[in-house]
């Protein structure tokens, strides 16, 4: 009689679009095992957090000066994909990421095209600086 192997857990692909498994990609940031090394990685992790309804991560990575008080998950939105168009770092503490996020609401498809601004700053005394989302300019949103 042969022993049966326990079923393997099916790896969950990361919604951020890099093609990696969630746990090894954005999941490590969401769990606090790692810090996103640049603004693009942070932006991808924020997109993934929106997909998964992880509003704690979205709030934690939003600069306090611009974070809305009423940040709630949007259960009507179904996120479909992310494409990063550009990532530019102006200096050690400022960067921009241009992206297109595709989504559906009520069966209608939309595209969110944004150029987001990020800053890198310490979260607490003695801790290394982290990237934070500040704001963004909509380049277009069309069906």
UniProtKB/Swiss-Prot annotation:
InterPro entries: NTF2-like_dom_sf (IPR032710), SEC_C_motif (IPR004027), UPF0225 (IPR023006), YchJ-like_M (IPR048469). Pfam families: SEC-C, YchJ_M-like. Gene3D superfamilies: 3.10.450.50. It comes from the Bacteria. Belongs to the UPF0225 family. NCBIfam families: PRK01842.1. HAMAP family: UPF0225. This is UPF0225 protein Reut_A0143. It comes from Cupriavidus pinatubonensis (strain JMP 134 / LMG 1197). The lineage of its organism: Bacteria, Pseudomonadati, Pseudomonadota, Betaproteobacteria, Burkholderiales.
């Amino acid at each position: 009689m042969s022993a049966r192997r326990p079923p393997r857990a099916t790896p969950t692909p990361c919604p951020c679009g890099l093609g990696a498994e969630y746990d090894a990609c954005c999941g490590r940031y969401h769990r606090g095992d790692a810090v996103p090394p640049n603004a693009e990685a942070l932006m991808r992790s924020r997109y993934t957090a929106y997909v998964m309804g992880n509003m704690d991560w979205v709030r934690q990575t939003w600069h306090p000066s611009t974070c809305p008080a009423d940040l709630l998950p949007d259960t009507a939105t179904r996120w479909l994909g992310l494409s990063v168009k550009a990532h530019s770092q102006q200096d050690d503490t400022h960067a921009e990421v241009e992206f297109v996020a595709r989504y559906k609401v009520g069966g209608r498809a939309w595209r969110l095209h944004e150029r987001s601004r990020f800053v890198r700053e310490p979260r607490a005394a003695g801790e290394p600086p982290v990237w934070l989302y500040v704001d963004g300019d909509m380049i277009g949103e069309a069906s």
